[in-house]
């Protein structure tokens, strides 16, 4: 298996997170929603191990990468849409020749026809983990799963519950949901996302999108909820002792980036 990748999804990059990720051996991509500044030109010299990706909204709309976090941020095209657009079109083991169109403000030399297999961590910037070793341990423990996420992967039985009434899915159920603020996907999951976007010219809310499309493939794709991701939740007030006790988990949400620094001491 080729080296796994990390995609940090943010509106604007934060120097503390960039400093942290710049030391990693993973291939790290910073997916930036804001297009007011060329961040590659601004940061590439200082953070030479990071790849800064910016994509125009119109390109996402053209390829059907919309609605992924409209419920959360009230935008048709968000950083999540841009992340999935970039990785699904460039890294999903297809013959799609879209790489030259999706490399906007990046130093990445991406081959969309890659034959190597790897997984990608998609992480929002209010997600905390202690070190690169946290991800390496999870990768070593669960090498063969297509989707790792905090979900029980049980089909929804009441579409009047949760957010189902606000989510439009164009394939037949069953449907699934979970917390997807930090999740690891294989290229096969990315390909399922690309196929849906191409077919229906839109996607749907990420907390239903990833588990539903993965489970839709029946036995072809494998999903798992590791204990290490059960601390990725909608809302929780974490304290320092939580991380002292368990440095193997990934945590969400911790929105104050200065707390990330404190919690890593």
Residue ranges and their predicted role:
Residues 94-115:
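Long, low-complexity Q/N-rich tracts
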Residues 128-212:
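Conserved catalytic core of nucleotide-sugar-dependent glycosyltransferases
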Residues 29-34:
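Short internal beta-strands
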Residues 196-265:
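C-terminal catalytic/acceptor-binding lobe
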Residues 1-16:
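N-proximal low-complexity "stem/linker" segments adjacent to membrane-targeting elements
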Residues 36-93, 117:
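Active-site-proximal specificity loops/subdomain of glycosyltransferases
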Residues 117-128:
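Short beta-strand-to-loop acidic/aromatic patch adjacent to the donor-nucleotide binding site
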Residues 13-25:
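Short, well-formed alpha-helical segments that are part of the catalytic scaffolds
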């Amino acid at each position: 298996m080729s080296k796994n990748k990390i995609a940090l999804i943010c509106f604007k990059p934060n120097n503390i997170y960039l400093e942290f990720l710049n030391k990693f051996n993973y291939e790290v991509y910073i997916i930036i929603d804001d297009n007011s500044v060329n961040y590659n030109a601004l940061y590439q010299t200082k953070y030479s191990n990071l790849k800064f990706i910016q994509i125009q909204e119109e390109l996402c709309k053209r390829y059907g990468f919309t609605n992924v976090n409209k419920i959360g941020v009230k935008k048709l095209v968000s950083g999540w849409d841009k992340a999935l657009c970039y990785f699904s079109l460039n890294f999903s083991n297809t013959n799609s020749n879209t790489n030259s169109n999706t490399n906007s403000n990046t130093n990445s030399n991406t081959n969309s026809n890659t034959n190597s297999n790897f997984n990608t961590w998609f992480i929002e910037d209010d997600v905390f983990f202690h070190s690169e070793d946290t991800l390496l341990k999870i990768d070593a423990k669960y090498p063969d799963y297509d989707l790792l996420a905090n979900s029980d992967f049980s089909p929804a039985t009441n579409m009047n519950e949760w957010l189902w009434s606000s989510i439009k899915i164009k394939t037949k159920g069953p449907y699934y949901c979970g917390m997807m603020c930090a999740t690891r996907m294989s290229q096969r999951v990315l390909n399922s996302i690309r196929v849906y976007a191409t077919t229906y010219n839109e996607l749907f809310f990420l907390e239903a999108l990833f588990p539903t499309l993965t489970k839709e493939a029946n036995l072809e794709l494998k999903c798992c909820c590791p204990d290490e991701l059960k601390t990725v939740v909608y809302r929780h007030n974490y304290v320092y002792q939580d991380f002292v006790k368990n440095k193997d988990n990934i945590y969400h949400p911790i929105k104050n980036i200065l707390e990330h620094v404190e919690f890593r001491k």
